[in-house]
Amino acid sequence: TFHKYKGEVCTGFQLHPVPGEQYHALAHNLKIIRFVADNCPGFIFPDGVYERGNDKSAIELLLGDKLLIDYVKGSSDWETVKEHIKVEEQKWIRKAKKFMLYEEQLYRCK
């Protein structure tokens, strides 16, 4: 049935990570979006305001970070973004640590 939707516009995707395996959802999704943007000639990021009461586009609201937006649009490289994510994750982990219920370490970009 993989030809069932041939020729139709894709409006989303689902990921099914392997249970028990460490998985970095942000990194994976950024790479998927970048791959699609680089390899699908008809792919565009919609222009204009995404929702009423906010002056940002959909991609700006979803990613919320200029460097991540630059990456998915092709004007930044993965190594730069990966280092940026590491720094931002460390800040978040320090803030979140006091609220954690378990000793398990949070998974980080490596």
Each model region followed by its residue ranges:
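C-terminal regions of mature proteins
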Residues: I69-K110
